[in-house]
Amino acid sequence: MPRKGPAPKRPLVNDPVYGSQLVTQLVNKVLLDGKKSLAERIVYGALEQARDKTGTDPVVTLKRALDNVKPALEVRSRRVGGATYQVPVEVRPDRSVTLALRWLVSFSKARREKTMVERLANEILDASNGLGAAVKRREDTHKMAEANRAFAHYRW
């Protein structure tokens, strides 16, 4: 275990095109094998497609999508006397954004459209309208937390 304590959080730079930290986080979630320029091309292309389809600011569409995907509760495993309980806990705001972006990107990859730009754009649009696999994942997470409410007193 490290003796110095947790590593300090590094500040995120605003994205150069939209001036948004959310877009920077999305680029970092799409990033694979250090190919940042490719990740930026995918994200900017997806946001352009979203703007063309909705006619509104793509960052506003992305924020609306994230609000529909961000979980408020999740379950965490807690071992008590030989049994493992799924204990519902509230999700910290920064973690909820991270989870929402992770779900958006992972469910984009699973879609059937031809290019990743189309997949990401359509997943963002679906999520902003309350549809799509990422929103379903949030609902499933909330259902799990609700089903395990009896173990809420094991919170830590």
From Swiss-Prot:
The keyword RNA-binding is assigned to this record: yes
Function: One of the primary rRNA binding proteins, it binds directly to 16S rRNA where it nucleates assembly of the head domain of the 30S subunit. Is located at the subunit interface close to the decoding center, probably blocks exit of the E-site tRNA.
Keyword tags: Ribonucleoprotein, Ribosomal protein, RNA-binding, rRNA-binding, tRNA-binding
GO molecular function term, any single one: rRNA binding
Identification of the protein by name: Small ribosomal subunit protein uS7
A GO cellular component entry from the record: small ribosomal subunit
GO BP term, pick one: translation
